[in-house]
Amino acid sequence: MTPSPLDRLLAALDELDADAAAALFASDGRLLTVDGRRAEGVEAIRTLLGDFLGQLRSTTHVTTAHWHDDDVSIAEVEASYELRDWLKLTDLRRVFLLRDGPGGYAELRVYGAHERPLASHQSAADVMPIGARWLPPL
C-alpha cells in the first residue's frame, strides 16, 4: 500500500528530519502550526520545522482517523514528544489539514490550541495549560 501524503510527512517528522519534511512542500508552500507560527516558501518551512524538531529528542505521530478528498487530506493525530530536557508530553491530539499540489504540498495547517513555543516552558507553573496539559505545535 502506498503511503498517503500525510503518512510521508509524519514519517519525516518522526525521524526528526526537517529537510525531508520540507522537501515534500511546493516551493511556495505554506505551513501554520498549532501555536500560530507561519511559514511560506520551502526555505522558511525548513527553518520553522528545524527549530521545532531541534527541541526534541524524539516524537511519534499516530493517525487515529483519516479522510481524503481529491487533493485534501484531513487527519486526527495523536502526537507524543520527548523534549531535549527529557520532559515527555504524550497523546496530544491534533488535526492536520494538508492540501497537496502538483509541485508538492501547497498548504499544511495543524490545529489543536494556540500556545507558546516548546522552548518557552520554565516549570510546570509557567507553562500555558490547555485543560490539564501543555501542548507543542505539531
Predicted regions and their residues:
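A beta-strand edge to alpha-helix "cap/lid" segment located at domain peripheries
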Residues: 1, 47-138
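A short gly/proline-enriched turn/hairpin at secondary-structure junctions
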Residues: 30-40, 52-55
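Alpha-helical elements of Rossmann-like donor-binding domains used by nucleotide-donor carbohydrate transfer enzymes
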Residues: 8, 20, 44-47
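Short beta-edge strand/loop motif at the mouth of beta-sheet-based domains
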Residues: 34-47, 68-70
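Short, ordered coil/turn segments that flank beta-strands lining enzyme active or ligand-binding pockets
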Residues: 27, 34, 101
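Short, well-ordered alpha-helical segments enriched in acidic and aromatic residues
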Residues: 16-28
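Short, aromatic-enriched amphipathic alpha-helices that serve as compact interaction elements
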Residues: 1-17
